Amino acid sequence: MDISGRHEEAGEYLMVAAAVHATVGTARLQSVVGMGFATSRNEPTLERTTAVVAEATDELPNPPDGPIVAERGEFYEEPEWEVEQFLGHDFKYVESIAERETVQAAHHAAYAARKLLL
């Protein structure tokens, strides 16, 4: 998953979270199964950020059978267990090349969706 727009622009916020459900091998993303999106105009905090991510994950056509994966910076480098408590779903930070590629796909999706909404 990835979030675009956690910064203030012209006195407003527009966070767009993209969740990508993908099948991955050991070294690469194999296929995208589905995507989910959610938005928030609230000032970002850990609680609000995890809420928009949970909403995007709920929008996936099929629930993921593995953990939600993100870059460390998405959740202010908080420990995985703390992020997991807010999400209510298994969570971990990126560890493999395939996970990084999946997060990169989510980044492109979140960025593009945000640009469409502006």
Task: Label every PLM stretch briefly.
Residues 1:
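Short hydrophobic beta-strand that contains or immediately precedes a catalytic carboxylate
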Residues 6-33:
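Acidic, metal-ligating active-site segments
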Residues 27-51:
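Acidic/glycine-enriched edge-of-secondary-structure segments
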